[in-house]
Amino acid sequence: MKLSKRIENLPPYLFVQISKKIAEKRAKGEDVISFAIGDPDLPTPKHILAELCKAAEDPSNHRYPETEGLPVLRKAMAEWYQKRFGVKLNPDTEVLPLIGSKEGIGHAAWCFLDPGDIALVPNPAYPVYAISSQLAGAEVFNLPLNKGNNFLPNLEAIPQNILSKAKVLWINYPNNPTGAVAGLSFFQEVANFAAKHNLAVCHDGPYSEIAFDGYKPVSFLEADGAKDVGIEFHSLSKSYNMTGWRIGMAVGNAKMIDALRRFKSNLDSGIPQAIQLMAIAALNGSQEIINQNCAIYQRRRDRLVEALRNIGMEVTAPKASLYIWAPVPESYTSASFATELLDKTGVVVTPGTGYGTAGEGYIRLSLTVPDEQIEKGIAKLAGYKKSS
């Protein structure tokens, strides 16, 4: 059987490879501490689970849901955006529930790109931005993110011959993998740039509720004219510890939202209604879980940053997100240092090159590791310093 060229050319997904390597080590009886994957270890709050259990008992929730989601869910999403960011959204035309934001990100490329178009994609970045663009037949032009520019793309450096074919601009703040943040002035620059060059902006903002030291991330949609040029993807996964329930949202430009809705209606059957109802409980209920999460992640961030500095790494503590972006020691590549840490200590980190060529020289560590495992990992890192 011959597979399609798009599948033959599709690289293995980064985190599948990492999970496989961890499983192989553990199958051999090795003690492995993984800081590789950003999947919250904290439980979904009980009041949210209670709504799920209640909804699951109702036979009306056992049938096909609608692609566009329950009106009451779209209303809850719009009201949450109004309260959190001061952004007004029409729940009927500017809000679309998603089966996790990754699903919407993957589908967006098919809505806004034709073969031969160019997608402007940060590098390093969450791999799905580039992969989905390539699957849709578009070319990817990388926008390097580097420390010298606070891991923000230099939009004015994009060549005119690229801009003439570019249709989509991807941005993501608080950023994965760098942990960088962007203020309203940057988002305003993006909105103005997109309007000038007729670009559709896709902002991925799932980490807006994971921030430290009193910092409060803003939404791209707070910028003047942002809704005229783009949409924002958000997720309940990180905010409410709901990665396993698969629910997120796309909000913003009505034309883009309608395109995504039409595409999805031909490919999926929507989000199970019981999960939609638990999402309403999350959005409308107490938001104290967000403060509790941030306090836990900040404590873990501080412990890990200290441990990395103790083995000689020059690490900047992130203001937000679930990740520490750490430069590797001189004479190492991202991959060689990650491999040495795994072989010598049993600590798993993600090589920066897993997020693009501009990730060379860095590793990423996730804060979604139980405290006990964090301390074990720190002890292993201390042992690495003694042996090196």
Swiss-Prot record:
Domain of life, per lineage: Bacteria
Species whose genome carries this gene: Dehalococcoides mccartyi (strain ATCC BAA-2100 / JCM 16839 / KCTC 5957 / BAV1)
Keyword Transferase: yes
Name of the coding gene: dapL
UniProt cross-references to HAMAP family, sorted A to Z: DapL_aminotrans_1
Keywords: Aminotransferase, Pyridoxal phosphate, Transferase
Self-association and partners: Homodimer.
InterPro entries, per database record: Aminotransferase_I/II_large (IPR004839), DAP-NH2Trfase_DapL_Desulfo (IPR019881), DapL/ALD1 (IPR019942), LL-DAP_aminotransferase (IPR050881), NHTrfase_class1_PyrdxlP-BS (IPR004838), PyrdxlP-dep_Trfase (IPR015424), PyrdxlP-dep_Trfase_major (IPR015421), PyrdxlP-dep_Trfase_small (IPR015422)
Pathway of action: Amino-acid biosynthesis; L-lysine biosynthesis via DAP pathway; LL-2,6-diaminopimelate from (S)-tetrahydrodipicolinate (aminotransferase route): step 1/1
Record-stated family: Belongs to the class-I pyridoxal-phosphate-dependent aminotransferase family. LL-diaminopimelate aminotransferase subfamily.
Entry-linked PANTHER family: AMINO ACID AMINOTRANSFERASE, L-GLUTAMINE--4-(METHYLSULFANYL)-2-OXOBUTANOATE AMINOTRANSFERASE
SUPFAM superfamilies, sorted: PLP-dependent transferases
Enzyme nomenclature, EC number: 2.6.1.83
Name the record gives this protein: LL-diaminopimelate aminotransferase
Residues reported in the UniProt entry to bind substrate: Y13, G38, K102, Y126, N176, R364
